[in-house]
Amino acid sequence: MEGIFAAYVLPALIIALKSVVLLVVLLIVVAYLLYADRKIWAAVQLRRGPNVVGPWGLFQAFADLLKFVFKEPIIPSGANKGVFLLAPFISAVLAMATWAVIPVNESWAVANINVGILYIFAISSLEVYGVIMGGWASNSKYPFLGALRSAAQMVSYEVSIGFVIVTVLLTVGSLNLTDIVLSQNTGLGTMLGLPASFLDWNWLCLFPMFVVFFISALAETNRPPFDLVEAESELVAGHMIEYSSTPFLLFFLGEYVAITLMCALMTVLFLGGWLPPVDVWFLSWVPGIIWFMLKLCFCFFLFAMVKAFVPRYRYDQLMRLGWKVFLPISLFMVVATATFLKVFGLA
């Protein structure tokens, strides 16, 4: 009996505990990133932003949570009730499930699997189904148009993101996210005789792919200037028009968790994960999770600034950018990287 407990029950309990801790921390982080997003946007527009609930408005996100939870969920009379309620649940759960393999520090992941990046790409590809189901089940034109746009947009930019990831995998030689971070201890900087630093991270040697990944991540998560799925001036709120109360909250949560995931992926693939910017003793003393969170917040700040400054693209411009600009660039970089590694015997 003790052998069964040690072999099966205890590992399952540990994974369940890790998952609960990850979920709680993730929801708190998302709440304050949403607060930061609103504050940054307000500052750009010379407004104060959230400033009533708690000191400096720090508890505004939790007040919004209570507001949504206690509202009555309204289901349109012509909607497919089962699919209508299932769609936001799928969107939120899939977005949170991808975080299981993200290492916020060395050996700090719910599941440190050897195909971590493949797992993320597979799960995130399924998130579009939540949007499509919600748009179709609402039995309304605007949500359906938003869902159709979402399907085309996400599929288009997943291609570019996939080739960016292939380029990183060629340079690292592993699908394990921890290995990808540790490989950035050495790079261009150390080849020039400098100590390990931010010059070794992949953002420098793969800078074109870093830019492609950043812009594609904006499109993949429906962030401005690529928020055609829920364009307020055209579709009011896109696939979420008919949603209210907790179902709307789940869609909104899934969207911001996906944004946070893209920021974390950018940190892991290009910004050295939990590695300090310079390998000196007083920076190495800082816990790796602190560096990871600082880099994640920096990436989110870039997302917020793009939202504040860049006007929305037309739909044809969005598609042209994905298929006629990013796809050729990413394909060329895959071929160029593979050729470079083969010619110089680094493969």
From Swiss-Prot:
TM helices/strands, residue ranges: 13-33, 50-70, 82-102, 115-135, 161-181, 198-218, 248-268, 286-306, 325-345
Record flagged with keyword Chloroplast: no
Organism superkingdom: Bacteria
Cross-referenced PANTHER family: NADH DEHYDROGENASE SUBUNIT 1, NADH-UBIQUINONE OXIDOREDUCTASE CHAIN 1
Enzyme class: translocase
HAMAP family per the UniProt record, alphabetical: NDH1_NuoH
Keyword Zinc: no
Function: NDH-1 shuttles electrons from NADH, via FMN and iron-sulfur (Fe-S) centers, to quinones in the respiratory chain. The immediate electron acceptor for the enzyme in this species is believed to be ubiquinone. Couples the redox reaction to proton translocation (for every two electrons transferred, four hydrogen ions are translocated across the cytoplasmic membrane), and thus conserves the redox energy in a proton gradient. This subunit may bind ubiquinone.
InterPro entries per the UniProt record, alphabetical: NADH_UbQ_OxRdtase_su1/FPO, NADH_UbQ_OxRdtase_su1_CS
Record membrane topology: Multi-pass membrane protein
Gene: nuoH
A Gene Ontology term for the protein's cellular component: plasma membrane
BP-aspect Gene Ontology terms: aerobic respiration
Annotated protein name in UniProt: NADH-quinone oxidoreductase subunit H
GO molecular function list: NADH dehydrogenase activity; oxidoreductase activity, acting on NAD(P)H, quinone or similar compound as acceptor; quinone binding
Organism: Brucella ovis (strain ATCC 25840 / 63/290 / NCTC 10512)
Broad class of the protein's primary localization: membrane
Family in the record: Belongs to the complex I subunit 1 family.
Catalytic activity: a quinone + NADH + 5 H(+)(in) = a quinol + NAD(+) + 4 H(+)(out)
EC number: 7.1.1.-
Assigned keywords, A-Z: Cell inner membrane, Cell membrane, Membrane, NAD, Quinone, Translocase, Transmembrane, Transmembrane helix, Ubiquinone
Cellular localisation: Cell inner membrane
Taxonomic lineage from the root: Bacteria, Pseudomonadati, Pseudomonadota, Alphaproteobacteria, Hyphomicrobiales
